[in-house]
């Protein structure tokens, strides 16, 4: 079972919050106290809350649920993509486009356009165009890939969001709330935990902390997918 210990979190600097003057009072229950002008997060709270979140992620993945990893901060972009690919899930790591969930119909059309352009680039269509037209289509394809590449195979709305930085990704959180999609999020001391179903109080800036959250989440999803595959195999075996 995917689990994270207190030692793991201390080594990754999960307990370092923001400067005290930037705090959100709603985070008070999860703060141990100030140290040198910085709020220290109470890991006695974070450890069980994160492990509870991991159990739920495993359950969702075990029911063949789709997990969308969201993290567009510079410190998170590469790690978010790597974690999602590691567990064969989906990601948004460049910029959250307003309506990405709530206006899925339009997003689906853009994904269709992206796939169409990819086909054109591979089947020789681009070679038949003028240099200028080929360049314009290549740029359009690259722009769409940057925004939608991580969700182009999602095939519908996700069953959960795993968010690095609830504050930074507040639009994504709000859209998920509107659609009743559960939100798992790292919530720092300057953030608002409202709208987050599974609050994980922790540092949302440090690369090592971000890596810890994502590695554990990916492991939890893989565990769920494995359980799902084993259940299917047993079902087929019994049917035979």
UniProtKB/Swiss-Prot annotation:
One GO BP: translation
UniProt KW keywords: Ribonucleoprotein, Ribosomal protein
Ribosomal protein keyword on record: yes
One CC-aspect GO term: cytosolic small ribosomal subunit
Domain of life: Bacteria
Molecular-function annotations in GO: structural constituent of ribosome
InterPro entries linked to this entry: Ribosomal_uS2, Ribosomal_uS2_bac/mit/plastid, Ribosomal_uS2_CS, Ribosomal_uS2_flav_dom_sf
Gene3D superfamilies, per the entry: Glucose-6-phosphate isomerase like protein, domain 1, Helix hairpin bin
Family statement drawn from the similarity comment of this UniProt entry: Belongs to the universal ribosomal protein uS2 family.
Database matches in PANTHER family: 30S RIBOSOMAL PROTEIN S2 PROKARYOTIC AND ORGANELLAR, SMALL RIBOSOMAL SUBUNIT PROTEIN US2M
The name this protein goes by in its record: Small ribosomal subunit protein uS2
Taxonomic source organism: Pasteurella multocida (strain Pm70)
Chain's gene name: rpsB
């Amino acid at each position: 079972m995917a689990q994270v210990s207190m030692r793991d979190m201390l080594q990754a600097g999960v307990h370092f919050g923001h400067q005290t003057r930037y705090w959100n009072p709603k985070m008070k229950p999860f703060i141990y106290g100030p140290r040198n002008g910085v709020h220290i997060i109470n890991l006695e709270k974070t450890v069980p809350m994160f492990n509870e979140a991991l159990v739920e992620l495993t359950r969702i993945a075990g029911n063949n649920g789709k997990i969308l990893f969201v993290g567009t901060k510079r410190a998170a972009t590469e790690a978010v993509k790597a974690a999602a690919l590691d567990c064969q899930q989906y990601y948004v790591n460049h910029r959250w486009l307003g309506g990405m969930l709530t206006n899925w119909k339009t997003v689906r059309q853009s994904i269709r356009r992206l796939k169409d352009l990819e086909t054109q680039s591979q089947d020789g269509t681009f070679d038949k165009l003028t240099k200028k037209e080929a360049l314009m289509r290549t740029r359009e394809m690259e722009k769409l890939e940057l925004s939608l590449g991580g969700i182009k195979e999602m095939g519908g709305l996700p069953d959960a969001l795993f968010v690095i930085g609830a504050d930074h990704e507040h639009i994504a959180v709000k859209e998920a709330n509107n659609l009743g999609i559960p939100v798992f999020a790292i919530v720092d001391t300057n953030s608002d935990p409202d709208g987050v179903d599974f609050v994980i109080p922790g540092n949302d800036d440090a690369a090592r902390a971000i890596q810890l959250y994502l590695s554990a989440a990916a492991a939890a999803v893989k565990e769920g997918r494995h359980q799902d595959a084993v259940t299917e195999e047993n079902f087929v075996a019994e049917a035979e």
